[in-house]
């Protein structure tokens, strides 16, 4: 099996807004970050480490529960 380098994202955290992404917590703020899926596991996916601006980055705090499609 190949080795994939990426950011592990729980499937239940994934939302669809302007493409596929997740909400992340920035202090008190909630922000939407796109993900660039490079591998699909059972209950998670891996997002590219170097996808660029507007995409999930390694140290982002992913919100898994309690956020609806509008970020509330």
Describe the residue ranges of each PLM region.
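Edge-of-domain interaction segments
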Residues: 1-72
């Amino acid at each position: 099996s190949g080795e994939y380098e990426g950011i592990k994202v729980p499937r239940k955290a994934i939302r669809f807004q302007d493409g596929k992404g997740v909400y992340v917590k920035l202090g008190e703020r909630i922000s939407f970050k796109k993900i660039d899926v490079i591998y699909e596991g059972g209950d998670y996916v891996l997002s590219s480490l170097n996808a660029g601006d507007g995409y999930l980055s390694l140290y982002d705090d992913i919100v898994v529960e309690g956020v609806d499609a509008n970020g509330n």
